[in-house]
């Protein structure tokens, strides 16, 4: 029997009534000071905390006061008049949360550890380990809550990652402001936040290693291959709790008692649920029904074949690239890679056999040698490709083509000119109605290249309008499902990608992309998609929007207005989802060695919020792929539902999300994000790099981004 626990511990206050220090606001702050004040304090208003004003007449002349939960950050910022007031921190639980935050920050900074806020406001404690020429920090997040998953107080604890820090100060290294963070005493600051007193006392602080600073600091970012990050996270959380929290010093500093000796809080059995077993089933071309594409796609073939296509190569004109192209041709067509060189009695090279690409696709391959392009240099590649594609005599009208781009450039290269080449080639090909598949040349030499081929075959199948695998039974009524994903890249405008009208087989109908702030363009696309859906399927039973963020009230009103303008009235549900890798609350299966709950498990967190698990464990003893859960928040976005989410709708929507997680075709490996979010995110990641910063029409109707 599974036993699920949260990464959270139960605590109780020794005394609910406390004396706390509050401050009146202070005017005349410049923009930077005002920003710091907002970061380091919480605002308490008379309207929201009437009992505080009633019990403390000294506040009667004020409408608001502030609690400084991040005190060091306010070093050189003036404060208003101070008031020591009595408060029931169970009754005023919001103030109680931040009073506990204040004391946690004080405690760990008192131990000399750097402490900062993470991007969603949690406390992040950095625990150091000396590595000789650098300091490695394990980062832990803490967040107090009241009456969340318990009837009292809790502290959620998570391991959020590792960071490496130089032992040289800003005085000793010449770094610009580009993405640089520094550890200054017990603060973690951006370079531009470092002030004069930081230089005087700490030499400006110690730079943190990132992809921009690692060369200048001659240090690498912390990278280690961990086969089970889920178990590692669980173990590190337990060690941190027992080492730093379940101590008299910590409990006295917060004036709390940690219950059950710091044991993790168990999930209530009534909050552990499972999708229907049929929702897990996938079907393939020969009729086989399974659940693990990594083991099944190669043997049973695509559920629906890709449309016939012809392919050609695009690669650098060099002896090495030409040899690589010939090897890849032989692997695709003949299932062989032979590069044996004999010198006397000594043989060197490779002699490997593979399953031919056409066997994966269950159709013959058609290579067109005269279409292949060998460009002279990276500097001329785009111009040569454009001229190559302008020769219409090379291409047969009505024929599907795939360009196999053999790239010597790693996708994560830090050379901007080379990095952009990858995206621009895809854009040029799409403008000529040609999709593409990029293969990183060094992978061909990898001893595991045989395991790359199923991924390539699955992606090509999807790009050519086939289905590598499908759902045996899609949990869907006549629903219109829209996915909206986002991409925000450093130095570029954020973009939204959208995927519209997934049908009952899980197929998409159309993609689009726009700048994140262009809500008018997004609304126009949504109207067009709704009109098209009604034309093909009549009125939708429900409009379900898978959204990368929580829906604002005004956005919900815009959606409802759009429905009225189209003459439609139907329930609208918005599902916000985030991958819970470093989230505040995750459930672990304490009865398993890898702590991973079974695939299809979903855990009720609070209100309409759930954790959903998709992996490859389907029994108590099966092996689980290490995929973190996604956190779902389901909300009603219109008045047709009266704001009520029924049990039936909840089960339907969660099951839909689970099944869309299982239709990711960029790889045969299972994924934890539904394609309704993952595919639009890919689109939004690519488009900002395109020359026109727009998605070509051809790219709106196929899975070119796989």
What residue spans do the PLM features occupy?
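S-adenosyl-L-methionine
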Residues: 1-54
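Conserved S-adenosyl-L-methionine
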Residues: 23-25, 315, 485
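Extended, highly charged clamp/arch subdomains and adjacent linkers
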Residues: 150-441, 694-706
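A short, compositionally biased domain-edge/stem linker segment
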Residues: 2-11, 290-302, 465-470
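Conserved beta-strand elements of the Class I
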Residues: 18-20, 310-314, 480-482
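Short, flexible hinge/linker loops that cap or flank conserved catalytic cores
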Residues: 13-14, 305, 474-475
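Short coil-to-helix leader/linker segments, especially the first N-terminal amphipathic alpha-helix
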Residues: 1-3, 282-292, 449-464
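Long, contiguous domain-sized segments
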Residues: 35-167, 172, 356, 362, ...
């Amino acid at each position: 029997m599974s036993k699920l626990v949260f990464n959270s511990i139960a605590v109780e206050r020794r005394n609910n009534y406390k004396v706390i220090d509050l401050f009146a606001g202070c005017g005349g702050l410049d923009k930077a000071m005002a920003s710091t004040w907002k970061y380091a304090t919480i605002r308490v208003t008379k309207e929201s905390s009437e009992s505080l004003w009633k019990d403390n007449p000294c506040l009667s002349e004020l409408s608001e006061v502030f609690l400084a939960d991040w005190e060091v950050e306010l070093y050189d910022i003036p404060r208003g008049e101070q008031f020591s007031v009595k408060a029931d921190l169970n009754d005023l639980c919001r103030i109680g949360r931040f009073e506990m935050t204040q004391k946690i920050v004080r405690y760990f900074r008192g131990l000399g550890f750097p402490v900062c806020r993470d991007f969603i406001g949690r406390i992040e404690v950095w625990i150091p380990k000396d590595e000789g020429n650098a300091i490695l920090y394990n980062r832990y997040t803490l967040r107090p809550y009241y009456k969340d998953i318990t009837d009292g107080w809790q502290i959620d604890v998570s391991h959020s990652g590792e960071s490496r820090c130089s032992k040289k100060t800003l005085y000793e290294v010449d770094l610009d402001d580009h993405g640089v963070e520094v550890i200054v005493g017990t603060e973690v600051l951006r370079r531009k936040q470092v002030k004069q007193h930081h230089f005087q006392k700490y030499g400006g602080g110690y730079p943190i290693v990132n992809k921009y600073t690692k060369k200048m600091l001659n240090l690498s970012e912390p990278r280690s291959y961990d086969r089970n990050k889920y178990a590692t996270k669980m173990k590190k959380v337990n060690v941190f709790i027992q080492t730093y929290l379940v101590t008299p010093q910590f409990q006295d500093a917060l004036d709390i008692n940690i219950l059950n000796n710091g044991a993790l809080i168990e999930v209530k059995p009534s909050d552990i649920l499972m999708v229907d077993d049929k929702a897990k089933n996938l079907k393939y071309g020969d009729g086989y029904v399974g659940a693990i594409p990594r083991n099944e796609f190669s043997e049973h073939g695509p559920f629906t074949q890709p449309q016939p296509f012809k392919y050609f190569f695009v690669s650098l004109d060099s002896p090495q690239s030409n040899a690589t192209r010939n090897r890849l041709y032989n692997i695709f067509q003949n299932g062989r890679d032979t590069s044996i060189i004999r010198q006397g009695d000594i043989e060197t090279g490779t002699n490997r056999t593979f399953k031919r690409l056409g066997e994966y696709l269950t159709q013959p391959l058609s290579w067109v040698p005269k279409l292949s392009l060998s460009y002279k240099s990276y500097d001329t590649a785009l111009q040569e490709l454009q001229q190559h594609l302008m020769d219409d005599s090379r291409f047969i009208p009505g024929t599907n083509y795939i360009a196999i781009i053999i790239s010597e450039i790693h996708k994560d290269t830090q050379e901007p000119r080379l990095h952009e080449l990858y995206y621009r080639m895809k854009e040029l090909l799409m403008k000529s109605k040609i999709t593409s598949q990029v293969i990183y040349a060094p992978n061909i030499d990898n001893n595991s290249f045989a395991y790359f081929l199923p991924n390539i075959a699955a992606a090509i199948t999807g790009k050519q309008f086939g289905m590598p695998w499908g759902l045996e039974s899609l949990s869907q009524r006549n629903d219109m499902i829209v996915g909206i994903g986002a991409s925000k890249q450093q130095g570029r405008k954020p973009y939204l990608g959208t995927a519209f009208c997934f049908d009952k087989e899980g197929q998409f109908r159309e993609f689009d992309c726009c700048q994140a702030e262009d809500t008018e363009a997004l609304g126009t696309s949504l109207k067009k998609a709704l009109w098209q859906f009604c034309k093909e399927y009549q009125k939708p039973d429900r409009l379900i929007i898978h959204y990368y963020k929580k829906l604002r009230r005004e956005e919900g009103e815009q959606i409802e207005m759009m429905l009225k303008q189209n003459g439609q009235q139907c329930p609208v549900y918005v599902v916000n989802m985030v991958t819970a890798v470093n989230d505040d609350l995750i459930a672990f299966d304490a009865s398993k060695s890898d702590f991973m709950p079974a695939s299809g498990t979903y855990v009720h967190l609070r209100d309409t919020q759930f954790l959903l698990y998709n992996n490859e464990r389907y029994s108590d003893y099966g092996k689980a792929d290490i995929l973190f859960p996604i956190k779902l928040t389901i909300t009603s976005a219109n008045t047709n539902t009266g704001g009520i989410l029924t049990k039936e709708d909840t089960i339907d929507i969660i099951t839909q999300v689970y099944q869309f997680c299982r239709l990711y075709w960029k790889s045969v490996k299972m994924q934890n994000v539904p394609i309704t979010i993952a595919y639009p995110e890919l689109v939004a990641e690519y488009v900002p790099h395109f020359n026109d910063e727009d998605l070509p029409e051809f790219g709106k109707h196929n899975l070119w981004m796989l």
